[in-house]
């Protein structure tokens, strides 16, 4: 049985082959498997952790292709659902010169939105050690109820719960709906990863310390705020710190946050009980975030999300050399 289970969307990213152009100007697109929770599952598997993915794909060529990608990377798909009622989600991605992205999603609806609460396999989740989910599937029913049901099962069975509220305003009817939807998963989590932009959006303040104060809750043991190439800042009960990033040549930042989160979970995994009880010291947390920064940086050096996720050897090499 997998030690880590991730839940949510998986899709096909069509990434512009040329940077610095709009979607309309792009001469061609390269197919790349992605979807934040699936990226985390593959990212952890490449680092050597046993993982499984739950959610729903279209019973179509793209859905079966995505299943094969997961399996080729060692991710268990035994509880993956398929439907003929909707297609597998697609996203078209244009890249700025610095590797940052703009998205156009095709989900009207997509299969991941139709994942239903009765399809959540309770024993499968209950036997794991870590459960990770994101916010994209919280935007529509029945996917939202299924995702939250899975998170509830995880919490009730003592799993360590990780959450990634992913800000994609185009997927919500309004900014307020996005804020409310993203916060629906907040209280379930022991670990949360957000960007500076997401922290400001959810809290309403650009003062990071104030934002963290406002967003903190009793179950939370670690909040990691990513800051792009600058690195990340972490907050834990009685501890906090900034950890600088690694300078690499960024080609495509798609999946960088997911690689960061996979790296963070990998680093913390042997000490989850100590983290839960507040027993990790500041230096141990810094080392975990440094590993996560290295994984995130490496993911920007290749196009696509899953194709760019690094191996343990690649992360260790960057940690050792700094370049």
Where does each model-flagged region fall?
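Glycine-rich phosphate/adenosyl-contacting loop at the front of the ribokinase-like
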Residues: 1-76, 115
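Conserved phosphate-binding/catalytic region of the ribokinase-like
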Residues: 2-5, 152-153, 204-323
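Short beta-strand scaffold segments in enzyme catalytic cores
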Residues: 42, 90-94, 231-234
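Conserved N-terminal subdomain of the carbohydrate kinase-like
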Residues: 50-135, 317-323
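Glycine-rich phosphate/pyrophosphate-binding beta-alpha loops
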Residues: 89, 135-139, 296, 302-305
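Conserved beta-alpha-beta core of the PfkB/ribokinase-like small-molecule kinase fold
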Residues: 130, 136-214, 220-222, 230-231
């Amino acid at each position: 049985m997998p030690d880590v289970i991730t839940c949510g969307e998986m899709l096909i990213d069509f990434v512009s082959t040329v940077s610095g152009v709009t979607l309309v100007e792009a001469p061609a697109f390269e197919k790349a498997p992605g979807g934040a929770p699936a990226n985390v599952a593959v990212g952890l598997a490449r680092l050597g952790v046993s993982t499984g993915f739950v959610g729903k794909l279209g019973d179509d060529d793209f859905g079966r292709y995505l299943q094969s990608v997961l399996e080729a990377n060692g991710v268990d798909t035994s509880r993956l659902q398929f439907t003929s009622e909707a297609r597998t989600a697609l996203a078209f991605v244009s890249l700025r010169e610095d590797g940052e992205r703009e998205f156009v999603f095709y989900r009207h609806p997509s299969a991941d939105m139709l994942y239903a609460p009765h399809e959540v396999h309770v024993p499968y989740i209950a036997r794991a050690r870590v459960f990770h989910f994101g916010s994209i599937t919280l935007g529509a029913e029945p996917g939202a109820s299924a995702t939250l049901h899975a998170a509830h099962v995880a919490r009730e069975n003592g799993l360590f719960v990780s959450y990634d509220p992913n800000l994609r305003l185009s997927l919500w009817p309004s900014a307020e709906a996005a804020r409310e939807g993203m916060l629906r998963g907040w209280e379930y989590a022991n670990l949360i990863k957000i960007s500076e932009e997401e922290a400001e959006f959810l809290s309403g303040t650009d003062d990071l310390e104030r934002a963290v104060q406002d967003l903190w809750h009793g179950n939370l043991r670690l909040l990691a705020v990513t800051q792009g190439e600058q690195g990340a800042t972490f907050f834990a009960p009685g501890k906090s710190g900034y950890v600088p990033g690694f300078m690499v040549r960024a080609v495509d930042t798609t999946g960088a946050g997911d690689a960061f989160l996979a790296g963070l979970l990998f680093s913390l995994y042997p000490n989850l009980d100590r983290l839960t009880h507040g027993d990790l010291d500041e230096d141990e947390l810094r080392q975990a975030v440094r590993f996560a920064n290295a994984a995130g940086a490496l993911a920007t050096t290749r196009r696509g999300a899953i194709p760019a996720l690094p191996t343990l050897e690649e992360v260790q090499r960057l940690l050792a050399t700094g370049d």
